Curated annotation (Swiss-Prot):
Sequence similarity: Belongs to the DNA mismatch repair MutL/HexB family.
Source organism (scientific name): Pseudomonas putida (strain GB-1)
UniProt-recorded name of the protein: DNA mismatch repair protein MutL
Functional note: This protein is involved in the repair of mismatches in DNA. It is required for dam-dependent methyl-directed DNA mismatch repair. May act as a 'molecular matchmaker', a protein that promotes the formation of a stable complex between two or more DNA-binding proteins in an ATP-dependent manner without itself being part of a final effector complex.
SUPFAM superfamilies from the UniProt entry: ATPase domain of HSP90 chaperone/DNA topoisomerase II/histidine kinase, DNA mismatch repair protein MutL, Ribosomal protein S5 domain 2-like
Gene for this chain: mutL
Keywords noted in UniProt: DNA damage, DNA repair
NCBIfam families in the cross-refs: mutl, PRK00095.1-2
Highest taxon of source: Bacteria
Gene3D superfamilies in the record: 3.30.230.10, Histidine kinase-like ATPase, C-terminal domain, MutL, C-terminal domain, dimerisation subdomain, MutL, C-terminal domain, regulatory subdomain
């Protein structure tokens, strides 16, 4: 600091312009703050009018409770709010806004006009302010019950900020995304958007499951709803509901991911980690899952006052939230079988909310214990699937046979029978059924193409199966079950490896010693910042022990759990399954193909191979007719 500089108070205008840098980044930021105020006022319809991407004009009009004439000037003051009164109120805040600085920040960098009327008032009142003149002017106006806010010429008095704005289309895309997120968060509110005089979006209130599904489809696209699983699970004060996209509906970018905590759209690394972990075994490398999920918990269980934009949150029991999210999504994705993917629901049904072990139970250190082994869970009998075509409808039922997990030694030879010559009796045993009611989801094999693909016929049409990919997933799941039932054996190191850590990392290792031991590790603390690795899992004897332990400790300290060891083990099991699976160009007889189809129907995650590629696809009669221009 130079000797001639003196400490002085900043002017209110300059202070607000500096604060606006945190709150007002672009027109989308303004829209977010104004829309959240409308929702907090109890609005049931919100109209948004935009010109030039929101830079020239952004007008938000609602039918909420309105603001009294006396409170209008105060609404533009910094840290003035009706949401909280004391610090303790932050622990239970449910409103989207509460900091009381958005309108002051916006009015400091734009020309703002706010008109409002309460239900008890005989007339409306209007207040105007500009960035260079912070003194609001209040006057009577005509307006129905509710509030309208006009923001014109954004950043007109801060040219440096305006230079950083992107093209009109880019800014409008960001603004539209804000509206989409809020429209997903509040199904009970109608949203209507116009840009340069043209209607862009019109979403009416959605009060039932069908209307909600229709709104999600309008925002995320009909393809998402056709490839999404509805979930609704509640346990230990946490409820997760919404829709998760099937792994086959993944995206190259993370642009179709919506997560809400108590109705607030958030981007949280703990949530992202739990979702990524749940999709780990079924998503192709470099692809991103799709989901619209809502987490509900007690307001005092989450801190929303982490950042001025309120995009980040902090959970009081982060470990429990992480385990609940992972367990729920993992179970939902594991339960997807071919019959679930054949019938795309026209409307989203309400699901029962499983409790206890139905939703997945977790041990002391976060590992998941299913109610029964993965491959021992029989599917419910008499599953019905409709044709879904335009012709005469029909239904068929199929009761799959529960498969039994095999010991690890036997798992490598699961399909040894594939390589034996078939007799006439075996062929007769797989004869096609005489009635449609006996057709299983993946149907019955017709032929093999180039020794790679199985062609089968089911009630919908033609099924094509990647033989090696499907068998690889079956082998992989059985190896995982066998490993879980038999446990992990440790491999003592001839010369223990010494690991230099921080004291915090060493404390974490000591705290989780039993967890490491169950996974085949033996760690010994030699000093405040020194650790000895004496034993590692036998399957990971080729791994770099020091690096693996350090990475696991980093995860444990950040998330309270780690999937790195399991990821290494799964990679090895996947390699074993790949080598043990039936190879391409291996000619299979019809009974062998049918045996593979039946096992696919009884295996978790059989829709994707270990690398996330699809294992089968369906072509209905309508699809085939289009290829030959039939019916035109």
């Amino acid at each position: 600091m130079s000797g001639g500089s003196r400490i002085q108070l900043l002017s209110p205008r300059l202070a607000n312009q500096i604060a606006a840098g945190e709150v007002v980044e672009r027109p989308a930021s303004v829209a977010k703050e104004l829309l959240e105020n409308s929702l907090d006022s109890g609005a049931r319809r919100i109209d948004v009018e935009v010109e030039q991407g929101g830079v020239k004009l952004l007008k938000v009009r609602d039918d909420g409770s309105g603001i009294s004439a006396d409170d209008l000037p105060l609404a533009l003051a910094r840290h003035a709010t009706s949401k909280i009164r004391e610090l303790e109120d932050l622990e239970g805040v449910m409103s989207l806004g509460f900091r009381g600085e958005a309108l002051a920040s916006i009015s400091s960098v734009a020309r703002l006009t706010m008109t409002s009327r309460t239900a008890s008032a005989s007339e409306a009142w209007q207040v105007e302010t500009e960035g260079r003149d912070m003194t609001p002017r209040v006057q009577p106006a005509a307006h129905p019950v509710g509030t309208s806010v006009e923001v014109r010429d954004l950043f007109f008095n801060t040219p440096a900020r305006r230079k950083f704005l992107k093209a009109e289309k880019t800014e409008f895309d960001h603004l539209q995304e804000v509206i989409r997120r809020l429209a997903l968060a509040r199904f009970d509110v109608g949203f209507h958007l116009r840009h340069n005089g043209k209607s862009i979006l019109s979403l009416h209130e959605a009060h039932d499951e069908t209307a909600r599904a229709r709104r999600v489809g309008a925002i995320c696209g009909p393809g998402f709803m056709e490839q999404a699983l509805p979930i609704d699970v509640e346990r230990n004060g946490l409820r997760l509901w919404g829709w998760v996209g099937l792994p086959t509906f993944s995206r190259s970018q993370a642009d179709l991911q919506y997560f809400f905590v108590n109705g607030r759209a958030v981007r949280d690394k703990l949530v992202a980690h739990a979702v990524r972990q749940a999709y780990r075994d079924v998503l192709f490398n470099g692809r991103h899952p799709t989901f619209v999920l809502f987490l509900e918990l007690e307001p005092n269980g989450v801190d929303v006052n982490v950042h001025p934009t309120k995009h980040e949150v902090r959970f009081r029991e982060g470990r429990s939230v992480h385990d609940f999210l992972y367990g729920t999504l993992h179970r939902a994705l594991a339960d997807v079988r071919p019959e679930d993917q054949l019938a795309a629901p026209a409307a989203v049904p309400e699901l029962a909310r499983p409790t206890g072990q139905q939703a997945g139970e977790f041990g002391p250190q976060g590992e998941m214990r299913l109610a029964s082994p993965v491959l021992e869970q029989p599917r419910a009998p008499q599953q019905s699937f409709s044709n879904g075509g335009s012709g005469a409808g029909y239904q068929y039922q199929y009761t799959p046979r529960p498969s039994q997990p095999l010991p690890a030694a036997e798992a490598q030879a699961v399909y040894r029978e594939f390589y034996k010559p078939l007799d006439n009796g075996a062929a007769a045993a797989t004869a096609l059924p005489e009635s449609q009611g006996d057709i299983p989801p993946l149907g019955y094999a017709l032929a093999q193409l180039k020794g790679i693909y199985i062609l089968a016929e089911n009630a919908v049409g033609l099924v094509l199966v990647d033989m090696h990919a499907a068998h690889e997933r079956i082998m992989y799941e059985r190896l995982k079950v066998a490993m879980a039932s038999e446990g992990l054996s440790g491999q003592p190191l001839l010369v223990p490896e010494t690991l230099a850590l921080s004291q915090r990392e060493a404390d974490c290792a000591e705290e989780h010693a039993q967890w490491f031991q169950r996974l085949g590790f033996e760690l010994q603390r030699l000093g405040p910042e020194t650790l000895a690795v004496r034993q590692i899992p036998a399957l990971l004897k080729q791994a770099e022990a020091n690096r693996l332990v350090q990475d696991v400790l980093a995860d444990l300290m950040e998330y309270g759990t780690s999937d790195r060891i399991q990821a290494h083990l799964n990679e090895l099991l996947g390699t074993m399954a790949c080598h043990g699976a039936v190879r391409a160009n291996r000619r299979l007889a019809i009974p062998e193909m049918n045996a593979l189809l039946r096992d696919m129907e009884n295996t978790e995650r059989s829709g994707q191979c270990n690398h996330g590629r699809p294992t089968w696809t369906q072509m209905g009669l309508d699809d085939l007719d289009k290829l030959f221009l039939r019916g035109r």
